[in-house]
């Protein structure tokens, strides 16, 4: 579920973790007031889709109109960095340990899943947001929506 030592994460593995976290996190409207992940994931997916063409267009447009190459490249690099910033943030968030209030709720949701007959892997170390995302995804598939009433 989570890595035993969340602090020793490679810089480039954060992008991979961020992509995995964005695919794991359930994009439910009832989670949006509590967790910022819904907005960050939507904006990151938007940036992954539209920023590369915008960067190419900006670069070609400034060069075609006789602009300088330096600002054109800087603008293109900034546009290309936006999706990477979103994935990096999601990767950092996925390995962040849960705060105490959310940790109690995490264990409540796990308890409800186990009461419904689901077999869950034991939690190793202190649970992080990736463990929460895995648990919430499974809870939305297996349980009714009333498990969110305690949130």
From Swiss-Prot:
<keyword id="KW-0997">Cell inner membrane</keyword>
<keyword id="KW-1133">Transmembrane helix</keyword>
<keyword id="KW-1003">Cell membrane</keyword>
<comment type="similarity">
    <text>Belongs to the UPF0208 family.</text>
</comment>
<keyword id="KW-0472">Membrane</keyword>
<dbReference type="Pfam" id="PF04217">
    <property type="entry name" value="DUF412"/>
</dbReference>
<dbReference type="GO" id="GO:0005886">
    <property type="term" value="C:plasma membrane"/>
</dbReference>
<dbReference type="InterPro" id="IPR007334">
    <property type="entry name" value="UPF0208"/>
</dbReference>
<feature type="transmembrane region" description="Helical">
    <location>
        <begin position="46"/>
        <end position="65"/>
    </location>
</feature>
<keyword id="KW-0812">Transmembrane</keyword>
<feature type="transmembrane region" description="Helical">
    <location>
        <begin position="69"/>
        <end position="91"/>
    </location>
</feature>
<protein>
    <recommendedName>
        <fullName>UPF0208 membrane protein YfbV</fullName>
    </recommendedName>
</protein>
């Amino acid at each position: 579920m989570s890595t035993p030592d969340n602090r020793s994460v490679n810089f480039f593995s954060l992008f991979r973790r961020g992509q995995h976290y964005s695919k794991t996190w359930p994009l439910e409207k009832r989670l949006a007031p509590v967790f910022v992940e819904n907005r960050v994931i939507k904006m990151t997916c938007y940036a992954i889709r539209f920023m590369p063409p915008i960067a190419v267009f900006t670069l070609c447009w400034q060069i075609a109109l006789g602009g300088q190459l330096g600002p054109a490249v800087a603008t293109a690099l900034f546009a290309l960095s936006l999706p990477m910033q979103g994935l990096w943030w999601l990767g950092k968030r996925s390995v962040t340990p849960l705060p105490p209030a959310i940790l109690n709720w995490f264990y409540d949701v796990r308890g409800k899943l186990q009461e419904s007959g689901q077999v869950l892997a034991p939690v190793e170390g202190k649970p992080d947001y990736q463990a929460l995302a895995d648990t919430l995804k499974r809870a939305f598939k297996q349980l009714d929506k009333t498990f969110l009433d305690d949130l």
